[in-house]
Structure formats: structure tokens, C-alpha cells
A protein has these predicted regions:
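Transmembrane-helix motifs of polytopic, lipid-linked glycan transferases
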Residues: 67, 237-261
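Perimembrane helix-loop-helix junctions
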Residues: 297-303, 326-357
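Transmembrane-helix signature of polytopic, membrane-embedded enzymes
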Residues: 20-22, 81, 230-233, 252-272
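Membrane-lumen/periplasm interface segments of multi-pass, membrane-embedded glycan/lipid transferases
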Residues: 363-451
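Membrane-interface alpha helices of multi-pass inner-membrane proteins
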Residues: 276, 307-323, 327-334
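Transmembrane helical bundles and short interhelical boundary loops of multi-pass, membrane-embedded
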Residues: 34-57, 357-363, 368-379, 524-560
């Protein structure tokens, strides 16, 4: 064969990747234009004075970057690396789509993390922060949507009829038919212009938060941000990004450690709620990562010393971050058969030592917080004087049937918490699309785990199911005892993020059932490939929707 003919045969292999990139990026750019036009028309951005070129540029740029990332990840063959890349990239979008202080308790977490980044490893209620921190906290109250919600009676300008209004759940409010739109952008303007105003913000001091260890990643990010000359807002995003790196690293370790049902793990890690917490200043970022890592280790056929060590470290850390309820994780390695246990220590001794380490860290953290605490005085119980843990526990023990009714009623009122996977903010920012689609996406992930090689066995799956039920009831009971007024008929303070490891176990259980019912022919490798595509794009859509609901629309019109 001549050299000319060889060159002709090789041309398609050179041109095909370039053509694929050009086609995909063109489609993505077109979709970006469509989304920007939809935002401009449906949410009236032009009438609100928002630059059309800016909106179009943002949408097109983001869509093109997403397409480029998807094409680049096609070259990555390792599932764990590909999954970690999706978690990191989508997590960055969540870090910036989520306005400051809007993750539950993020104000306290921000203040504690900022203090640690300044080298403060003790706790002083009278110690303040730089003035720009005061301004940031004043500009962005926690539960921003609830703080800017109003209800009452107004007059419709078209029909002149009185009608009630309630702007709960809407981050953007328009006062009058053609009036000004109030949004969280006003808070950014308030913070960014604080140097030019005469008013002095209320001074903030260190919060009632006495943890150090889980806030170290965020503190490192804040220290780096200050090193580059960034202010309070830059420190917030710097802390979020390094916290996201910690979450990504733990998820990567979990994906590498999981020997079965890896699509289920990737799906729960890329759930918008998981990324929302992982890309915040909350200690849930590392806590969720530890949960996923421990469950991933339990998919291994055999345990050696290294596996046992990683599980013990994750379990001890989880207990140091959220004590007592996480002691339940100590018993999970006992579900392994004796033939599967290749660790030098016996299972019973290992469980006792892990429990001892968890309790030691828990008590050490409590003593550290007590001894290095200054000027706090008597700390009031959360929930007020009507909350009494001992009395509530006694009430539960005396009225077990009534408490079962309380559990069931709370689950019913909150859509089983599975239907609240799209409830963001301080439970004040509902995104209906995510709440509706998250359960089907989890079911799809279960279907991708139906390969025969992904089976965990009846014994292990059965005990994991029991653990999931006990953990869910335990989490609800803990909130009933510590946060809920004595005898109340519903449980106060529960959020769907507490149940994310339970939803992972539910997906594993659904996969076991579907494997028997459907007799699928899907291979594990094909399931993993489909999982990256499905869950990656779903996470991307979740970040875009979170940004849309906080900054673009829908807009609630209030008629006075």
C-alpha cells in the first residue's frame, strides 16, 4: 500500500475527535442560547434591567464548559477518577450557585471556621471579627428567603379584587405589577458597597460552636483566601472550595473502595442535596464523605487490616463530628462472616476498640470545648425551656405506641423526607423539579446496579437494611429528645440531609429486588458508564436550577 493511501485511511481517525468536539460544543452553545432566551422572556430579565449579552454569555459559556468537561471525561477510563471529577466540577457550581450563609447553620459554621483560620483554637463569646465579616453577616441573614417573606391581602390591578398573597419559597419578590424586584442580589450590593456607607453593622462575636476538627479544611481555604488579599466574601468561597475538595477526596476513596454497586454510590454522592452540603462550610461535607466511605468498604468480599483501619478512622471521625448517634456504625463490621474477616484482630475486639476510640474522641472534644470556653455563661437549651431531654425520653418509654404515631406522622408530613431532596436553604428554598425527579433518579441508579456481579448476598443486605431502619429511627428519636418540646406530636428540626446514607442503603436494597424481578443483562461496566452520564448531568442541572431560583426566577408578585 502506498504512503498516500495510508494517509487517506488515517485522516478520519484524526478528524473524528475534532468533528465530535465541534458538534458537541456547538450543540451546547445553542442550548445555552435557548436557556438564556427562556430566562429573559419568562422571568422578564430585560424589563428588570439585566444585560441580555451578560445573561447569554453566562449561559453559553457554562454550557460550553460543561460540554468540554463531558468530552474530556470520555478519555478517563477509571470509574473512581471520572466520578470524582464530576463531583468536583459540579460541586464548584454549587459552591457559587448557593448564596452566602444559606446552608443550614452556615453562619455559625462560617464564624467558627473563620476564627480557626485566624489561629484561634479556643472559644470566646466576647471576641469579634474584622468589620467586613460583620458586614457579610448583616447582608446575608440565614434563611434569607424566610427573612424576606411576607403575607397578607392585596388588590389585583387588573380585576381590582382583593386577593391573599404569601411569598414563602420565593427568593425573588416584585412589589407591584411593574415594581422593583427584590432579590439576593441586593444583599451582594449591600456587602460590596459597605465601605461607602455611613452605617455601622452590628458586631458579631464567636458562636456557640465548640468543634475544631471538622472545620479545618474550610479554615485552610479561608487562610489561603486571605493570603491572596481576599475579604470576608472571598474567604467564604475559599472555605467552601477546600471543604469541597475534602468531600471529593473522601468520595474518591469510597468509589475506589467499593467493589459492588458503584453506580449507587456515585448517584448519592452527586445528588444535588449531597453536593449542596459538600460544597458548603458545613461539617456535613466530611461527615457525608465518611458515611459513604464506610458503606463502600462494606461492599468488599473480604476485609484485611488496611480496610479495617480505614473504616475505624472514618467511624471515629464521624463520632467526633456528630456524637452518639454515629456509634451505631461501630457494629456494622460484625455483619461480615468469619470467613470474610482477614483482620488480625477478632471482630468483637475490633468493634470494642473502634467504640473506645469513638467515645474517647467524643469525650475529648466535649472536654476541650468546656475547658477552652470563655465568657459564654450559661448556654440556653436550643428550643427553649419546653425542651427537656430526660423528661422527653421518659415520655417515649412510657408511651411507645404514641411515639410510633409521632414517627409515622412526622414522616407523612415531610413526604418521608425522600420527597424533600429538592428542599434547600434553611428548608425555605423548595425546587419542585428536583424533589419530583430525585427518587426516580435513585431508582434508575438501583437499576444500574442489577448486574449479577453486584450482589451483596442476602445476609449482608438484610443486616444493612436493618441498620438503615435503626439509623433512621435513631436520628429521628435523637431530634425528638434533644430539640422537640416534651410530648409534642411531631418531631422538630429534621432535614432530609440526615437521611442521605439511608437513601443509599435503600438504593442497594432496591437493586437487590430488581435483580431478581427483572433478570437483567446489564453488565457492571455498562452500568457504571451510564451512571456517570445520568448522575453527572443531573447534578449539573441541579446546580443550574439552584442558581436560577435564587438569582433569576420565578418571581412572586406582591400587590399592595
Amino acid at each position: 500500500m502506498s504512503n498516500v493511501s495510508k494517509k487517506k485511511l488515517s485522516l478520519p481517525t484524526v478528524q473524528q475527535p475534532a468533528a465530535r468536539w465541534a458538534f458537541v460544543l456547538t450543540v451546547c452553545a445553542s442550548l445555552g442560547v435557548v436557556v438564556s432566551y427562556y430566562w429573559r422572556v419568562f422571568y422578564g430579565l430585560d424589563a428588570r434591567g439585566v444585560s441580555a449579552a451578560g445573561v447569554t454569555g453566562l449561559c453559553v459559556g457554562l454550557a460550553v464548559l460543561a460540554g468540554a468537561a463531558a468530552l474530556a471525561l470520555r478519555r478517563v477510563r477509571d470509574f473512581a477518577k471520572k466520578g470524582a471529577a464530576c463531583i468536583l466540577l459540579c460541586g464548584v457550581l454549587f459552591a457559587f450557585a448557593n448564596p452566602p450563609m444559606q446552608t443550614p447553620d452556615e453562619t455559625d459554621h462560617y464564624l467558627r471556621t473563620y476564627a480557626i483560620s485566624m489561629g484561634r483554637f479556643d472559644f470566646d463569646a466576647q471576641r469579634g471579627y474584622p468589620e467586613d465579616v460583620d458586614e457579610l453577616v448583616a447582608a446575608f441573614p440565614g434563611a434569607w428567603v424566610n427573612a424576606h417573606t411576607s403575607a397578607g391581602l392585596g388588590t389585583d390591578p387588573d380585576t381590582h379584587a382583593e386577593q391573599p398573597f404569601n411569598s414563602a419559597g420565593y427568593a425573588l419578590k416584585q412589589y407591584g405589577k411593574d415594581g422593583r424586584v427584590e432579590s439576593i442580589r441586593d444583599s451582594f450590593e449591600q456587602y460590596l458597597t459597605w465601605l461607602y456607607r455611613d452605617s455601622v453593622p452590628q458586631r458579631v462575636t464567636e458562636p456557640v460552636s465548640f468543634l475544631i476538627l471538622p472545620f479545618l479544611p474550610g479554615a485552610l481555604g479561608m487562610a489561603l483566601a486571605r493570603l491572596f488579599g481576599l475579604g470576608a466574601l472571598g474567604c467564604l468561597y475559599g472555605g467552601r472550595l477546600v471543604n469541597l475538595l475534602a468531600y471529593t477526596a473522601l468520595c474518591y476513596a469510597a468509589l475506589r473502595s467499593a467493589h459492588k454497586c458503584r453506580p449507587a454510590f456515585l448517584c448519592i454522592m452527586l445528588m444535588p442535596m449531597s453536593l449542596y452540603m459538600g460544597a458548603s462550610l458545613s461539617y456535613d461535607a466530611t461527615l457525608l464523605g465518611c458515611y459513604y466511605l464506610m458503606l463502600a468498604l462494606l461492599t468488599r468480599d473480604e476485609w484485611d487490616d488496611k480496610t479495617a483501619l480505614f473504616y475505624a478512622l472514618a467511624c471515629v471521625f464521624a463520632n467526633g463530628t456528630k456524637p452518639y448517634i454515629n456509634l451505631l456504625w461501630v457494629v456494622l463490621p460484625l455483619i461480615l462472616r468469619k470467613s470474610e474477616w482477614k483482620v488480625r484482630l477478632s471482630r468483637a475486639v475490633y468493634a470494642v476498640l473502634t467504640a473506645a476510640g469513638a467515645l474517647a474522641l467524643t469525650l475529648g472534644v466535649e472536654q476541650y470545648g468546656t475547658l477552652l470556653r470563655h465568657n459564654y455563661g450559661a448556654i440556653a437549651r436550643q428550643g427553649g425551656t419546653t425542651v427537656n431531654g430526660g423528661a422527653q425520653l421518659l415520655f417515649v418509654l412510657k408511651n411507645p405506641l404514641r411515639y410510633i404515631a409521632v414517627l409515622l406522622g412526622t414522616l407523612y408530613e415531610n413526604d418521608g423526607f425522600l420527597g424533600q431532596l429538592g428542599l434547600f436553604g434553611w428548608k425555605d428554598m423548595p425546587i419542585a423539579f428536583i424533589s419530583i425527579t430525585a427518587p426516580p433518579v435513585l431508582l434508575a441508579a438501583a437499576m444500574l446496579c442489577t448486574a449479577q456481579t453486584d450482589t451483596l448476598g442476602r445476609r449482608r443486605m438484610g443486616w444493612l437494611g436493618v441498620f438503615g431502619l435503626v439509623y433512621a429511627v435513631g436520628a429521628m428519636t435523637a431530634m425528638y429528645i434533644t430539640y422537640t418540646p416534651v410530648g409534642m406530636v411531631r418531631i422538630v428540626g429534621l432535614q432530609t440531609r440526615y437521611f442521605l446514607p439511608v437513601w443509599l442503603l435503600l438504593v442497594l436494597a432496591a437493586a437487590a429486588v430488581l435483580r431478581r424481578v427483572l433478570a437483567p443483562r446489564l453488565t457492571a461496566a455498562k452500568g457504571e458508564t451510564l451512571a456517570v452520564t445520568l448522575c453527572g448531568w443531573y447534578a449539573f442541572a441541579g446546580a443550574v436550577l439552584l442558581f436560577q431560583h435564587y438569582f433569576v426566577g420565578p418571581v412572586y408578585t406582591i400587590y399592595k
